[in-house]
């Protein structure tokens, strides 16, 4: 996992070795000797099985994300709160709490690549994995749904200044590959918006990877929010967890807040005179 790679290597949940010879297996066991001494679970298989373990694991986690996002979309049309639903679901030991946070969809270098690879592999085998295929389709639709949330919040997008907080596909990384923020920004720009953005780590990479995006990258949260018609949280960085809403209210042009990660309680934000729109909650 990006951001926790060293920790994951030193103490993984399990070790999977795919090999065709005892020599190769023994080499891998020597590499992981310390972890094996900790009595961590180890699975030894042929190469094809090991590869499928990787794809199946990532596709399953991606499916959890797309699933909870679909439930959140339903909550937007009824008097149900996805935050409470996710918490209650996560308390079920058969489900678990991880990857049940709704938002703008998954990104990065693994989930998009592995889900698409698994779908293509299945097609080539004549055995389309329909659930994974739907997971990809749901995720592809997320930026458009998030764009509509912003549009419903402020109306006409043209000539509006919109602040994007978070560009990396997740916190604690500077990776902008397949980041949901990028497609959301593209849609906003295509509809005539002016974009100001801030990310604690990913702005340099974003400028390099997407030089065609007409974005004003700012040095901090508050400079990004100055003169804004709508503040949008896209990545749940800890830096965004303690925003000074009194200060924000004094510098924005229009007090509109779109929380695509449900970082804040709606009533709290509204108490400062902001409108609030989250994902799957009123």
Task: Kindly give the residue locations of the regions a language model identified.
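Structural/interface elements that position substrates and couple domains in central-metabolism enzymes
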Residues: 1-282
């Amino acid at each position: 996992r990006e951001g926790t790679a060293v920790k994951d290597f030193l103490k993984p949940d399990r070790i999977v070795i795919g090999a065709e010879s005892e020599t190769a297996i023994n080499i891998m066991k020597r590499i992981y000797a310390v972890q094996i001494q900790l009595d961590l679970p180890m699975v030894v298989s042929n190469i094809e099985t090991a590869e499928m373990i990787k794809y199946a694991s990532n596709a399953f986690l991606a499916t959890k994300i797309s699933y909870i996002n679909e439930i959140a979309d339903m909550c937007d049309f009824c008097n149900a709160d996805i935050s409470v639903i996710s918490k209650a679901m996560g308390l079920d030991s058969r489900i678990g709490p991880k990857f049940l946070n709704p938002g703008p969809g998954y990104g990065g270098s693994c989930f998009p690549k592995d889900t698409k690879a698994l779908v293509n592999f299945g097609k080539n085998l004549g055995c389309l994995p329909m659930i994974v295929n739907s997971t990809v389709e749901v995720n592809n639709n997320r930026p458009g749904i998030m764009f509509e949330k912003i549009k419903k919040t402020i109306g006409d997008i043209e000539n509006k200044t919109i602040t994007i907080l978070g560009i990396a596909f997740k916190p604690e990384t500077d990776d902008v590959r397949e980041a949901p923020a990028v497609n959301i920004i593209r849609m906003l720009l295509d509809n005539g918006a002016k974009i100001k953005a801030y990310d604690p780590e990913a702005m340099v990479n974003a400028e390099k990877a997407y030089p065609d995006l007409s974005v004003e990258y700012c040095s901090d949260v508050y400079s990004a929010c100055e003169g804004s018609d709508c503040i949008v949280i896209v990545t749940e960085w800890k830096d965004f967890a303690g925003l000074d809403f009194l200060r924000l209210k004094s510098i924005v042009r229009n007090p509109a807040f779109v929380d695509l990660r449900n970082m804040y309680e709606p009533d709290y934000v509204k108490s400062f005179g902001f409108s609030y729109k989250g994902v799957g909650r009123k």
